[in-house]
Amino acid sequence: MTFRNCVAVDLGASSGRVMLARYERECRSLTLREIHRFNNGLHSQNGYVTWDVDSLESAIRLGLNKVCEEGIRIDSIGIDTWGVDFVLLDQQGQRVGLPVAYRDSRTNGLMAQAQQQLGKRDIYQRSGIQFLPFNTLYQLRALTEQQPELIPHIAHALLMPDYFSYRLTGKMNWEYTNATTTQLVNINSDDWDESLLAWSGANKAWFGRPTHPGNVIGHWICPQGNEIPVVAVASHDTASAVIASPLNGSRAAYLSSGTWSLMGFESQTPFTNDTALAANITNEGGAEGRYRVLKNIMGLWLLQRVLQERQINDLPALISATQALPACRFIINPNDDRFINPETMCSEIQAACRETAQPIPESDAELARCIFDSLALLYADVLHELAQLRGEDFSQLHIVGGGCQNTLLNQLCADACGIRVIAGPVEASTLGNIGIQLMTLDELNNVDDFRQVVSTTANLTTFTPNPDSEIAHYVARIHSTRQTKELCA
């Protein structure tokens, strides 16, 4: 038997993990083992919302050392993280300023300013990226306007996965899939857009040309002295998750479900027409020159905050209580900016219901019901938008990531969307990370080859839509009302 041992470092906005993958070439089987799992979260520092990158680096090194202590020879390492955030370095590679998180309020008002000064359509034609108030484009503008004293000291700007790869190898890299999330990469050249960079106030010299997944950045020297390749995987966690989505044919859509929900489809060409702009569709970079045509949805961040505020530890019990409640009594727009980082999520949800003359969710289960129903309805709207954009309906939706373990939300999604839902794999970002490593090691041919491995080894569960469910009837009433309004217009 020929084995490959690859390590994936997968950092999300709420947790991180170091996972060991063992790939057996002859039987094309892939097994994962969790080596180290650790918390991640927002911190308050000097008036900013920040990430504790030192703690994250220590956790990464601890996980890697654990693998080496077992006597396992690692063939390669890959790192993926969330998008848009960055670390600034001086000429000596030391940090400049704080690693500010995207949920910080420093970018307030800057997206509207950019649209006014540059033109919304021009920004979109250049980048193909959706307008989110925390995109790197606006973060850099906030930095250069609000902290000009830092500018003379900055030599490099590294996105989060590139920063941690640099800390392991001493080599700098700017990986393409994550770079596209910045709204600073030109969709035609795959390089930094000079006009957008100029508006941000950043110096182009801070960045190197983005590289596509699959190159070796450098080497990490393990405690035993071995030099282990660190591979530039699809370092945006959603890009990795999509690689591991067992998409079957052109009519398959995906939903990467976690702190954020990202719904979309793969395409060989981007969509930057007026319809895509009006729907705020993004065209993020994927592996093998594919585009991830998708839309960001606030996701389980709302639930995570409610769990924290209400000190709820038994999630299965909460879901069971939630399932017993009637559907669609409390509906909010999860994508409203008010939910990005409110002082109290529970109060913000209640206020949104109060302002729209709805009943007020008071209990833990009612708040969860509000979140799940609202997410499922938004999923249905977004899936409809995506189908209209490409001119073809979808036949199935693959839900991947940690959120796919929520069977209630999976069924609500199937019912609201009226589509077959296939849930799994759970550790999609980790698997996609491993997939690029195996391709770099010449163990697999391409993404489609890797997806065949995932399909045969991952635990997948199918949810069939129930047209008689409460949420399905609610969606039907909404569509009927919309059609009536359109006919009367």
UniProtKB/Swiss-Prot annotation:
Pathway(s) of this molecule = Carbohydrate degradation; L-rhamnose degradation; glycerone phosphate from L-rhamnose: step 2/3
Biological process terms in GO annotation: glycerol metabolic process; rhamnose catabolic process
Is Mitochondrion there in the keyword field? no
**SUPFAM superfamilies attached to this UniProt entry:** Actin-like ATPase domain
Its EC top class is transferase
Residues noted as binding substrate in the record, renumbered to the chain: 83, 236-238, 296
Query: What keywords were assigned to this record?
Result: ATP-binding, Disulfide bond, Kinase, Magnesium, Nucleotide-binding, Rhamnose metabolism, Transferase
A GO cellular component term found in this entry reads: cytosol
List required co-factors. Answer: Mg(2+)
What EC number(s) has UniProt assigned to this enzyme? 2.7.1.5
List the CDD domains.
Answer: ASKHA_NBD_FGGY_RhaB-like
Q: Known Pfam families for this protein? A: FGGY_C, FGGY_N
InterPro entries the UniProt entry points to: ATPase_NBD, FGGY_C, FGGY_N, Rhamnulokinase
Kindly give the HAMAP family that the UniProt entry links to this protein. Answer: Rhamnulokinase
The family this protein is said to belong to: Belongs to the rhamnulokinase family.
List the NCBIfam families: PRK10640.1, rhamnulo_kin
Q: What is this protein called?
A: Rhamnulokinase
Q: Name its species.
A: Escherichia coli O157:H7
